[in-house]
């Protein structure tokens, strides 16, 4: 079943290769969507794919790349048209 989740990741998540690492992990898991920095220092990600793969990526967001220090990940289900790829915005 295809699911779509919007995530907000807080902590030390900018300037630590978080977006590039998220894209790499998403591609590995077959998840589509996008990831971007927010002006308030958080990172926002939209994840779409098979429920199991999206859940695996959500769990990975709590760790992130080596230099990241994630303190919170908020997520909510959203409904959007199907996405074809994963991109860094």
Curated annotation (Swiss-Prot):
Listed EC numbers: 3.6.1.7
Keyword Metal-binding appears in the UniProt entry: no
Keywords attached to this entry: Hydrolase
Pfam families in the cross-refs: Acylphosphatase
GO molecular function, one term: acylphosphatase activity
Record flagged with keyword Glycoprotein: no
Catalytic reaction equation(s): an acyl phosphate + H2O = a carboxylate + phosphate + H(+)
Record-annotated Acylphosphatase-like domain positions: 4-89
Residues forming the catalytic site: 19, 37
Primary enzyme class: hydrolase
Source species, domain of life: Bacteria
InterPro entries xref list: Acylphosphatase (IPR020456), Acylphosphatase-like_dom (IPR001792), Acylphosphatase-like_dom_sf (IPR036046), Acylphosphatase_CS (IPR017968)
NCBIfam families membership: PRK14451.1 (NF011022)
Record-stated family: Belongs to the acylphosphatase family.
Protein known as: Acylphosphatase
Species annotation: Nitrosococcus oceani (strain ATCC 19707 / BCRC 17464 / JCM 30415 / NCIMB 11848 / C-107)
Origin organism lineage: Bacteria, Pseudomonadati, Pseudomonadota, Gammaproteobacteria, Chromatiales
